[in-house]
Design a protein with these regions (language model features):
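Noncatalytic, solvent-exposed loop/strand surfaces
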Residues: 1-179
């Protein structure tokens, strides 16, 4: 994806492949030297990847593939966060090789700008079999609800739904009922 520039750093999402290659990446690089500052793998492969403790059991013993980042990241300098939307797990047509929820695919992910550490995530489709990942980059907005202003982030999915979260915490702005 095209990189986003902020404070002498380039932030880019990477979609390595739809199939057969582990995870998508979010990379921060020094805009002057090109030196990599940090890397976040949307499908953690082992204990060295941030988020491994949260995601490891969500793949069972299956292959950990997919999660490409197809759209540019979005930066909130006030909160010190960068937001990305991750793609579907792979293969998307046959989930038998990847039991579980398959974190952090089909998710909006907030990372700390300076370190790339996971701040929060929200997975919209668990164990996706339908290729229902997000089709847009994250959108930052402010909205007034019950008389107070909420800093929000939105994502649109291929399932024709628009998801809205609190930018700082990842909590849904409106209830999201799973059936």
């Amino acid at each position: 994806t095209p990189p986003v520039y902020y404070d002498n750093t380039l932030y880019a999402g990477v979609a390595l492949s739809e199939n057969h290659i582990p995870g998508g990446l979010v990379i921060a690089a020094d805009a002057t030297t090109g030196a990599i500052k940090w890397v976040f793998n949307t499908v953690p492969q082992g204990p060295r990847d941030d988020g491994w403790e949260i995601a490891k059991d969500s793949w069972g013993d299956g292959q950990k593939v997919g999660g490409g980042v197809w759209t540019p990241p979005v930066i909130d300098p006030e909160l010190g966060l960068v937001y990305v939307n991750s793609g579907n797990p792979s293969p998307d047509y046959d989930g038998s090789a990847r039991p579980g929820m398959n974190l952090f695919t089909n998710a909006t992910i907030a990372l700390e700008l300076e370190t790339g550490k996971l701040a929060w995530y929200y997975q919209t489709v668990h164990h996706d079999l339908w290729d229902w990942d997000h089709v847009t980059g994250p959108l930052l907005f402010d909205v007034t609800k019950d008389g107070r202003t909420i800093k929000g982030v939105a994502a649109a999915g291929k399932n024709c739904l628009m998801y809205l979260w609190h930018r700082e915490t990842g909590e849904p702005i409106n209830p999201m009922v799973e059936t």
